């Protein structure tokens, strides 16, 4: 019997900001569209994007992503002056922008891009997280917990094969 493919395909991840999940504790995540130029889309298709030093700020009621490096391709950007660190406007609804603005201004939250992925094969989306920075002891606790999970899985696997 042949399985039917689900109508919702898993989004294809382009880039992930691993440092963000280590340095921040996210309380809420949301999806935002990106306003991009043609050469940026071509570079993203080739995987020439880096989210590691990236953050989101709000200005004049709009959200912008700063620090996202998109390296231009030599073949795709011959007639356009390319700025790899250009500000990218995030496409969010007014309700989402107002919610973000309230939390950032009043409660000291940060907005950090977590990952970039393709939605429906043609749209580049960014998963942004709303959270606060972790303290050093929180980072150590997370590292210990992660190491314990790995060790526990190793012991369970060993028990399963030998016992």
Curated annotation (Swiss-Prot):
Keywords: Cytoplasm, RNA-binding
Subcellular location field: Cytoplasm
Signal peptide: none
Gene Ontology cellular-component terms listed: cytosol
Chief subcellular location: cytoplasm
One GO process term, biological-process aspect: trans-translation
Alphabetical list of InterPro entries matching this protein: SmpB, SsrA-bd_prot, SsrA-bd_prot_CS
GO MF annotation list: RNA binding
Superkingdom, taxonomy of origin: Bacteria
Family: Belongs to the SmpB family.
Physiological role: Required for rescue of stalled ribosomes mediated by trans-translation. Binds to transfer-messenger RNA (tmRNA), required for stable association of tmRNA with ribosomes. tmRNA and SmpB together mimic tRNA shape, replacing the anticodon stem-loop with SmpB. tmRNA is encoded by the ssrA gene; the 2 termini fold to resemble tRNA(Ala) and it encodes a 'tag peptide', a short internal open reading frame. During trans-translation Ala-aminoacylated tmRNA acts like a tRNA, entering the A-site of stalled ribosomes, displacing the stalled mRNA.
Protein name: SsrA-binding protein
Organism: Shewanella sp. (strain W3-18-1)
């Amino acid at each position: 019997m042949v399985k039917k493919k689900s109508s919702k395909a898993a989004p294809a991840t382009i880039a992930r900001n691993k440092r963000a999940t280590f340095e921040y504790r996210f309380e809420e995540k949301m999806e935002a569209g990106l306003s991009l130029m043609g050469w940026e889309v071509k570079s993203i298709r080739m995987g020439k994007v880096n989210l590691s030093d990236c953050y989101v700020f709000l200005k004049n009621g709009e959200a912008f992503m700063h620090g996202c490096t998109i390296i231009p391709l030599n073949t795709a950007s011959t007639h356009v002056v390319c700025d790899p660190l250009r500000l990218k406007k995030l496409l969010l609804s007014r309700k989402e922008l107002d919610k973000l603005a309230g939390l950032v201004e009043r409660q000291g939250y940060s907005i950090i891009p977590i990952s970039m992925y393709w939605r429906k094969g043609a749209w580049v989306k960014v998963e942004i997280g709303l959270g606060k920075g972790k303290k050093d002891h929180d980072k150590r606790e997370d590292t210990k917990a992660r190491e314990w999970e790995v060790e526990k899985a190793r012991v369970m696997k060993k028990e399963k094969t030998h016992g």
